[in-house]
Amino acid sequence: MQLSDFSFELPDELIARYPLETRSASRLLHLDAKGQYHDHMFTDIIDLFEEGDLLVLNDTKVMKARLKGKRATGGAIEILVERMLNHTTAYCHIKASNSPKAGAELFVGADNIPVIVRGRHENLFVVEFSQPILPVLEQYGQLPIPPYFNREAEEIDTERYQTVFHNPEKIASVAAPTASLHFDEELLAELDQKGVKKTFVTLHVGAGTFMPVRTDDITNHVMHSEWCDVPQETIDLILATKARGNKVIAVGTTATRALESAAQAHGGKIAAWTGDTQIFIYPGYEFCIVDRLITNFHLPESTLLMLVSALSNRENILAAYEHAVKDRYRFFSYGDAMLIDKLEV
């Protein structure tokens, strides 16, 4: 399967660079189990879900992971914290005119907090901070909004690039689980009133989510690693949902990858799991848990577009995307949403 099989034309003006005034005011394109698409508003999910269905949400929180700084010589640098190893050490991306060597001292924030490059880990730098990382990020960091916004993070992003249900103790992502950004408290309350249940998994989203696929044959692509947790409480609800004939609805590709990683770790069995995942889902993958998926519109030739193509099929997804472009849907993180049903075969 070739990378070019997942290409489509997207006018630049359809990239949503700011959120709508109201979270749940987005549009929704429903791709049903027969491969037919239907236009809705996002709030129509109330009518598209059944009592007893189960929403699975990712409760991670986005860090203010981007730090501006300088070398001892004064040259500008930028650090993006990818993963904290402990309170003062992290794997980081570093942008600089020349790649810093082990032992290099850098300074971040307005107060020039010292950090030291201790070495490399694959394509990342191991960086030791002179102070606890999270308070430094909170005081001096910026939210690492996606590169296709083509702007700096602003005050509006502080609220709107986080989900309303994030767990403040689980602050470790460098990107939001964007399908969840459409849910506000009012919509969640309406779903609860209807009898749609919800549960949580955790997947801390890494910067690799924005990395392009660089192999023509997609099966040669190696996914970045992300930490996830699928607790027993969630598994119990999933098993009960399936036992009564209801649907498991993953909210976002991150929740999907967490759930399917847990199943793959147990040979396809639905069971709890915690660990690092590099799961790569593309057409031909057999889903073990997910019946329906809420997701945003994704970049051409991205692993996320390949994932959604596995749930329906490539032709159906690209036809739906072509319709979305013609009908002026908004794309990417702050854009509109899709509800994709597993294709009936």
From Swiss-Prot:
<comment type="pathway">
    <text>tRNA modification; tRNA-queuosine biosynthesis.</text>
</comment>
<dbReference type="InterPro" id="IPR042119">
    <property type="entry name" value="QueA_dom2"/>
</dbReference>
<dbReference type="GO" id="GO:0008616">
    <property type="term" value="P:queuosine biosynthetic process"/>
</dbReference>
<dbReference type="InterPro" id="IPR003699">
    <property type="entry name" value="QueA"/>
</dbReference>
<dbReference type="Pfam" id="PF02547">
    <property type="entry name" value="Queuosine_synth"/>
</dbReference>
<keyword id="KW-0808">Transferase</keyword>
<dbReference type="InterPro" id="IPR036100">
    <property type="entry name" value="QueA_sf"/>
</dbReference>
<keyword id="KW-0963">Cytoplasm</keyword>
<comment type="similarity">
    <text>Belongs to the QueA family.</text>
</comment>
<keyword id="KW-0949">S-adenosyl-L-methionine</keyword>
<comment type="subunit">
    <text>Monomer.</text>
</comment>
<dbReference type="GO" id="GO:0005737">
    <property type="term" value="C:cytoplasm"/>
</dbReference>
<comment type="function">
    <text>Transfers and isomerizes the ribose moiety from AdoMet to the 7-aminomethyl group of 7-deazaguanine (preQ1-tRNA) to give epoxyqueuosine (oQ-tRNA).</text>
</comment>
<dbReference type="InterPro" id="IPR042118">
    <property type="entry name" value="QueA_dom1"/>
</dbReference>
<dbReference type="GO" id="GO:0002099">
    <property type="term" value="P:tRNA wobble guanine modification"/>
</dbReference>
<protein>
    <recommendedName>
        <fullName>S-adenosylmethionine:tRNA ribosyltransferase-isomerase</fullName>
        <ecNumber>2.4.99.17</ecNumber>
    </recommendedName>
</protein>
<dbReference type="GO" id="GO:0051075">
    <property type="term" value="F:S-adenosylmethionine:tRNA ribosyltransferase-isomerase activity"/>
</dbReference>
<keyword id="KW-0671">Queuosine biosynthesis</keyword>
